Amino acid sequence: MTLKLILAFVIAFAVSAVVGFFLVPYLKRIKAGQSIKENGPTWHMSKQGTPTMGGLMFIAAIAVVCLSVGFECMAEGEYGHLFCLAFALVFGAIGFLDDYEKLKKKQNLGLTAGKKILLQLAAAVAFIFLMRRFGYVALDSLYIPFWNKTVPISEPLYVIFAAFVIVGTVNSVNLTDGVDGLAASTTMPVCIFFAVISILWGERFLSLGVFASGIAGGLLGFLIYNFHPAKVFMGDTGSLFLCGAVAALAFAYDMPLILVTLGIMYIIEALSDIIQVGYFKLTHGKRVFKMSPFHHHLEMGGWTGHKWKETQIVALFAGVTVLFAVLSFIGVFHRFGV
């Protein structure tokens, strides 16, 4: 089983790296350049025109892994990786539409927030019922990490909870994609956590482990082109795909609450944005952070007095995520009597 996950990682890394070799020049040739927000850090304007939609390279890599290494899982009747892939692809498609609108308008304004939320909610509810149909999710109970207990919950309440968590996760992960290499470096430890858990819990979770390991490998290949200074951005095509993948894995393993610790940096990013907007409105113009989300606050020298380099921010986010992934591992270690 471990060898299959390693193989999934290696194949995804290789495919992502090779696809990127051809994709980046192609995106430059068709002028698929990113428009930078004018209200962002001023030095980010130097990134104007950097190719976007680079997430296509790790999306292709994960698809190859699911149809190659995941083939044995399908032969044994395990389709978890395909459900997660399909769900992530739906969100990737929403992101692609958003990127397309931005490129067409030549400004950083794609789909309206309302349209994106409605599409995300529809996808979330459909996914939950599909996973329930194939036995991956129980809509009448909720697992509590660290306490190692499952508490009863009504089906309507679970669906509302699931929709909230999925849409919240999607938009939190998306906020993290604001510095070269940040979203990919923060999400890799999350996916490695799910891959390791599948080894611990046995063959039942092999297909999900293949998917998680494939994402981690694909992201490493993507970082060849996305690490500072980035030659390409993943765009909403890639970031929303990742958002969907992380949310799908949490629910497919039937432990969505693990995202409270495992996704700590996503939560910090989202909370910083919510606090900033709320405080700004309540105080008629005052701010808690120099700029939100939190990674921009660090870039602007908030609290510390010196401006953080992009590589330092990436190291901080990835390091904290690794620590909380270990903590999360402790929180679910005994779930299946390990």
Model-derived segments and their meaning:
Residues K37-P51, K106-L119:
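Juxtamembrane helix-capping/reentrant segments at transmembrane boundaries
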Residues K104-T112, I144-I153, T283:
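Membrane interface segments of multi-pass transport proteins and intramembrane proteases
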Residues M1-K28, F58-A93, F127-R133, D140-L142, ...:
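Alpha-helical transmembrane segments
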Residues V24-P41:
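Membrane-interface loops
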Residues L111-T112, L119, A124-V137:
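Internal, non-catalytic "lid/hinge" segments that mediate substrate recognition, gating
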Residues G77-T112, K116-I117:
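Hydrophobic alpha-helical hairpins/lids featuring a short glycine-rich hinge
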